[in-house]
């Protein structure tokens, strides 16, 4: 269906009580990398690690937020996110948002203190944007999602689409991505929520 290749960045999961050496992280993932809790939201406990000395403190920090920690390779590219919902008679994939963070990554400050620029629709070539929309819809179906979801990607050199994260309970504050995308689509969030609720009954 024109999805093209989809990439997933190199990652490791650690559970509490499991130890990993600095050398293992460097050999398997490389530096810089992200070390973050594998649960929760708002980028609490996330560290961008650039040096060997920072690996273990970052793991400890992440374990304060979750019993599982994820170590992910760093990717340089354009961060985007795309929301979607489906009912029995319609499919809605929202305009894509591009995230330009003033910080090292899209952390709590960038999310909630206005330290980022969010551009909807994203500045992507149309064929790349269409691939992202098709991919978002396909993932929704593959996972059997219901209600609203939001999927985060990074577009790297050569217009490679890299899947980052699937959010099945996306934020719904006024400044969150989904309400922004709903507005950009010329829709009203109340109508969207009514649509989803009525589809349940």
Give residue ranges: language-model regions.
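Rossmann-like NAD(P)H-binding beta-loop-alpha module
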Residues: 9-37
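Peripheral (often C-terminal) accessory segments that flank ATP-dependent C-N-forming ligase machineries
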Residues: 23-25, 118, 122, 130, ...
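Phosphate-binding site of ATP-dependent enzymes
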Residues: 50-134, 155, 160-162
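Conserved metal-phosphate-binding beta-hairpin within the catalytic cores
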Residues: 73, 83, 140-172, 182
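A short, polar/charged loop-to-alpha-helix boundary motif
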Residues: 105-106, 173-180
């Amino acid at each position: 269906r024109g999805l093209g290749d989809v990439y997933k960045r190199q990652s490791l999961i650690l559970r509490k009580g499991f130890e990993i050496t600095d050398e293992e992280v460097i050999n398997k993932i490389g530096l810089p990398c992200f070390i973050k809790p594998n649960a929760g939201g708002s980028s609490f406990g996330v560290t961008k690690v650039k040096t060997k000395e920072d690996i273990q403190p970052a793991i400890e920090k992440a374990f304060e937020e979750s019993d599982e920690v994820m170590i992910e390779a760093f990717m340089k590219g354009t961060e985007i996110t795309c929301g979607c919902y489906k009912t029995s008679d319609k499919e809605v994939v929202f305009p894509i948002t591009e995230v330009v963070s003033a910080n090292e990554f899209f952390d709590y400050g960038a999310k909630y203190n206005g330290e980022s620029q969010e551009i909807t629709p994203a500045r992507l070539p149309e064929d790349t944007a269409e691939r992202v929309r098709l991919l978002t819809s396909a993932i929704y179906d593959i996972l059997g999602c219901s209600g609203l979801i939001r999927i985060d990607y990074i577009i790297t050199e050569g217009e490679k689409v890299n899947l980052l994260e699937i959010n099945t309970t996306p934020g719904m504050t006024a400044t969150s991505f989904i309400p922004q995308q709903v507005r950009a689509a010329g829709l009203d969030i109340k109508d969207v929520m009514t649509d989803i609720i009525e589809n349940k009954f």
